[in-house]
UniProtKB/Swiss-Prot annotation:
Keywords: Isomerase, tRNA processing. One of its GO terms (molecular function) is tRNA pseudouridine(55) synthase activity. Responsible for synthesis of pseudouridine from uracil-55 in the psi GC loop of transfer RNAs. InterPro entries: PsdUridine_synth_cat_dom_sf, PsdUridine_synth_N, PUA-like_sf, PUA_sf, tRNA_psdUridine_synth_TruB, tRNA_sdUridine_synth_fam1_C, TruB_C. Belongs to the pseudouridine synthase TruB family. Type 1 subfamily. The keyword Oxidoreductase does not apply. Gene3D superfamilies: Pseudouridine synthase, PUA domain. The gene is truB. It comes from the Bacteria. Its EC number is 5.4.99.25. This is tRNA pseudouridine synthase B. NCBIfam families: TruB. It comes from Haemophilus influenzae (strain PittGG). The active site is at residue 48.
Length: 306
């Protein structure tokens, strides 16, 4: 007798996955989507297969706000091996250069100063950035190097954790668009010995709590033993994806107009400007709007369940 077909459903929220090593972000996202039987899913910035750690998975209506998490600050713990450069700048690549390591901790501390604050970074060829519609990594795999422009990034914190030659461990708090592999490769060049990433763990995205993260095998066990309603309790509310934005609570009439996508006048006693989170009179999350003086302009709205 054939098994009943899985029924996909509308389910909204953010699942905090502790990504395992060895899987692509897209593969693990698809697995989470299947376990929740969700109609729609999206991740919020890929982690390399080598990397582990926090990967927020947006389900349903939360996918409308995934860009906010893609743009959010991130934190990483990274271990680099000095003395070797690879073509991918991590341990999955081929070693392309080997040099002796004559580096002491004081040299490392001095070198780190160059990478704090606002800097320019040339993205690695082994990245998903596109050139003429094709990801850079596809060119790299064909042995083709494409000219890349340096991009502005911000390293808010770059903390020395430990150094046991040839392995160096650092903690990084950075802006969107930062490639940790490139950061390590550049640091290795400043130190004069080369370096590549051997361990990378994302420890934070925006303000999401580390304690809420769950491993995929834990989710699989729960899915085998409990109904979907129990799995849904693991989801964080959709509005957590935009928690950095100020909140604006509307009255009944304003909520109704916003629901139809209409602009709304309001007193703006809080003197708000820019993007805000909108909540109805019943404290339901409505979406994101742009405040222009005393006008609320809807930008991205939740589709409310009937």
């Amino acid at each position: 007798m054939s098994r009943p077909r899985k029924r996909w459903r509308d389910v909204d929220g953010v699942f905090l996955l502790d990504k395992p090593q060895g899987m692509s972000s897209n593969d693990i996202m698809q697995k989470v989507k299947r376990l929740f039987q969700a109609n729609k899913a999206g991740h919020t910035g890929a982690l390399d297969p080598l990397a582990t750690g926090m990967l927020p998975i947006c389900l349903g209506e939360a996918t409308k706000f995934s860009q906010f998490l893609l743009d959010a600050d991130k934190r990483y713990l990274v271990t680099a091996k000095l003395g070797e450069r690879t073509d991918t700048s991590d341990a999955e690549g081929q070693v392309v250069e080997t040099r002796e390591v004559h580096v002491e901790t004081p040299q490392i501390l001095t070198a780190l100063e160059q990478f704090r604050g606002d800097i320019l970074q040339v993205p690695t060829m082994f990245s998903a950035l596109k050139h003429n519609g094709k990801p850079l990594y596809e060119y790299a795999r064909q042995g083709i190097t494409v000219e890349r422009e340096a991009r502005p990034i911000t390293i808010f914190e770059l903390n020395f954790i430990e150094y046991h030659a040839p392995f160096l461990t650092l903690e990084v708090h950075c802006s969107k668009g930062t490639y940790i592999r490139t950061l390590v490769d550049d640091l290795g060049e400043v130190l004069g010995c080369g370096a590549h990433v051997t361990m990378l763990r994302r420890t934070a995205v925006a303000d999401y709590p580390v304690a809420e993260m769950m491993l995929i095998n834990e989710l699989e066990l729960l899915a085998e033993s409990f109904p979907l309603s129990e799995l849904d309790r693991l989801l964080l509310p959709t509005d957590t994806a935009v928690s950095k934005l100020p909140a604006l609570h509307l009255d009944v009439e304003q909520s109704k107009a916003i629901g139809f996508g209409q602009r709304v006048k309001f007193a703006n006693e809080q003197q708000l400007s820019g993007q805000v989170r909108l909540f109805s009179a019943e404290n339901l999350f409505l979406g994101v709007a742009l405040i222009d003086g005393n006008i609320i302009r809807p930008q991205r709205l939740i589709t409310q369940s009937a």
